[in-house]
């Protein structure tokens, strides 16, 4: 009788790059992420943006910063992303 062992592997987490548009909340920033989508019928490439609430533990990001974010477990009713690093500070 062989014991069936399965190694549980964690799924790859989504990583996005975006621009901070609000830092008024404590330990939270709002990041606007751009996605380019091709129209199904006409083929035109369109820009779609979505605003995501991101957990910023040290309150280090400010408005205008370009940041790298990663998907995580739900931290609140609307927060499912966390700040990985600040790629470029605002001028």
Curated annotation (Swiss-Prot):
Protein name: Small ribosomal subunit protein uS17
A GO cellular component entry from the record: cytosolic small ribosomal subunit
Reported function: One of the primary rRNA binding proteins, it binds specifically to the 5'-end of 16S ribosomal RNA.
Quaternary assembly: Part of the 30S ribosomal subunit.
Keywords: Ribonucleoprotein, Ribosomal protein, RNA-binding, rRNA-binding
Keyword rRNA-binding: yes
Gene Ontology BP annotations: translation
Organism: Salinispora tropica (strain ATCC BAA-916 / DSM 44818 / JCM 13857 / NBRC 105044 / CNB-440)
InterPro entries: NA-bd_OB-fold, Ribosomal_uS17, Ribosomal_uS17_bact/chlr, Ribosomal_uS17_CS
Assigned protein family: Belongs to the universal ribosomal protein uS17 family.
Keyword hit for Ribosomal protein: yes
Highest taxon above the source species: Bacteria
Pfam families in alphabetical order: Ribosomal_S17
UniProt-recorded Gene Ontology molecular function terms: rRNA binding; structural constituent of ribosome
PANTHER family, per the entry: 40S RIBOSOMAL PROTEIN S11 FAMILY MEMBER, SMALL RIBOSOMAL SUBUNIT PROTEIN US17M
């Amino acid at each position: 009788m062989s014991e069936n062992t399965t190694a549980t592997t964690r799924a790859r987490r989504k990583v996005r790059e975006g621009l901070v548009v609000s830092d008024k909340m404590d330990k939270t920033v709002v990041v606007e992420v751009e996605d380019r989508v091709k129209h199904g019928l006409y083929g035109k490439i369109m820009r779609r943006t979505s605003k995501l609430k991101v957990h910023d533990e040290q309150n280090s990001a400010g408005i205008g910063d370009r940041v790298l974010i990663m998907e995580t477990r739900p931290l609140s009713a609307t927060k499912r992303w966390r700040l990985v690093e600040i790629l470029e500070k605002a001028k």
